[in-house]
């Protein structure tokens, strides 16, 4: 089972949820609060090989990019996948 950590207000926090598989794709889930969780979908850009991490909040019901999440929440959150 894979885990990940994320940065919140300068503090490194370990994931509170495990990994789930939906439609054959990995979904990394983290719980940020009692009623707020994020689904993180790692995707790769074929042309460059760069990893793009998408975040889906159960509050917004839409997939956003990290900078969109930071703008929406007013906090800096960075997610780091650990193999």
Predicted regions and their residues:
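Negatively charged, low-complexity tracts enriched in Asp/Glu with abundant Ser/Thr
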Residues: 1-27
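Residue-level recognition of conserved beta-strand positions in structured domain cores
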Residues: 17, 30-32, 41-42
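Short loop/turn positions at the edges of beta-strands in beta-sheet-rich folds
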Residues: 22, 32-34
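Alpha-helix boundary/interfacial micro-motifs
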Residues: 26-28, 50-51
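Acidic, low-complexity intrinsically disordered segments
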Residues: 36-83
